UniProtKB/Swiss-Prot annotation:
Pfam families: eIF-1a. Component of the 30S ribosomal translation pre-initiation complex which assembles on the 30S ribosome in the order IF-2 and IF-3, IF-1 and N-formylmethionyl-tRNA(fMet); mRNA recruitment can occur at any time during PIC assembly. Signal peptide: none annotated. It comes from Thermosipho melanesiensis (strain DSM 12029 / CIP 104789 / BI429). The lineage of its organism: Bacteria, Thermotogati, Thermotogota, Thermotogae, Thermotogales. GO terms for molecular function: ribosome binding; rRNA binding; translation initiation factor activity. Disulfide bonds: none annotated. This is Translation initiation factor IF-1. Keywords: Cytoplasm, Initiation factor, Protein biosynthesis, RNA-binding, rRNA-binding.
Amino acid sequence: MSNKEDIIKMEGTIVEALPNAMFRVELENGHKILAHISGKMRKNFIRLVPGDKVVVELTIYDLTKGRIVYRKKS
């Protein structure tokens, strides 16, 4: 189980929708990562489309993959 200290939250924009609720997200610093939807977003049927601004959680162990935890209001 990971600690709160091991998680980095960053903002980004969805670039591409991929199969199985995966998305390619471009972070504010220009890096592109692969991210999946968190369980609460999936449970509440929150739809994401390319161009949406999102908050992504990254672990310090793998900075190429993340979890989308929040969709910003546009």
